[in-house]
Amino acid sequence: RSFFGFCLLAAVLVMWQHRPSTTSKRMNKLAVFGLIAVALFALYSVGTTLLVQGYLGQANQQRTVQQIEDSGSLLIGGRPEWAGTLALMREQPMGFGLGTVPTSQDVWAAKAGMRAIGTDTENGYVDNYMFGGHFKLHSIIADMWATFGIVGFALGLIMLFALVYSLIEQLSNRTATGLVCLFAALGVWDLAFGPIYKNLPDVMFALAVTLTASAFGTATTESPTDSVEVPAVGGSARA
């Protein structure tokens, strides 16, 4: 469901930056950020409506309706692990450390946070996947916090900022390609909601694509445009 939304978002951003314009000046970065926020909200609203109405399949419809009924929001209901993560952050702000095995108190605190948003925590997912001898919080940033504490959390936020800023920079210059828009959006999603063991390589690839494209675009836009006069072969030199 989310991948369809990211493809649609990338298409909207590409079409927007190729709109006719009467000026060649770059757009303000804050305005571009506002545009992305509005586009995300619009796509989320439209996507939720399509899912609830069953236009994207009956199975997706049933799951979406159930998640909204349980938590009141598709995003919160679809990824309830953050509710458990926030509960753990309140109990242990500095994280847990590499190789730490969750205690029964840790599991109870996470379950309490997830139950607060209407999530069923007695289906084996929390006990076996999330806390079965390890911390798997289904978020790269959250997993980095649990494993490496504040330093890991800060590194995750830096990667998130790099992706967002690089995308905004290229959109303001009208140099963002469809792949850059797609990979940047996927990278941000994986940092927030993707398991670290599966999606960290995807985030590294997204960073490589977006930062390389941003550096190349900056070098192109800042290169001198004045042509150098080359004397014709055989021509006389001018004083």
Segments and roles (model prediction):
Residues 56, 61-77, 96-103, 153, ...:
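C-terminal/domain-terminus segments
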Residues 1-54, 172:
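Hydrophobic alpha-helical segments of polytopic membrane proteins
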Residues 11-28, 163-175, 215-227:
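Cytoplasmic membrane-interface segments at the C-terminal ends of transmembrane helices
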Residues 25-33, 41-90, 99-103, 107:
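Flexible juxtamembrane loops connecting transmembrane helices in multi-pass membrane enzymes
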Residues 131-139, 143-147, 155-193:
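Loop-to-helix entry and N-terminal half of a specific, functionally important transmembrane alpha helix
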Residues 5-13, 36, 40, 151-161, ...:
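Lipid-exposed faces of alpha-helical membrane segments in multi-pass integral membrane proteins
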Residues 11-14, 178-191, 195-234, 239:
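Transmembrane alpha-helices of multi-pass inner-membrane enzymes
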Residues 69-76, 80, 94-148, 167:
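Long extracytoplasmic/lumenal interhelical loops at the membrane interface
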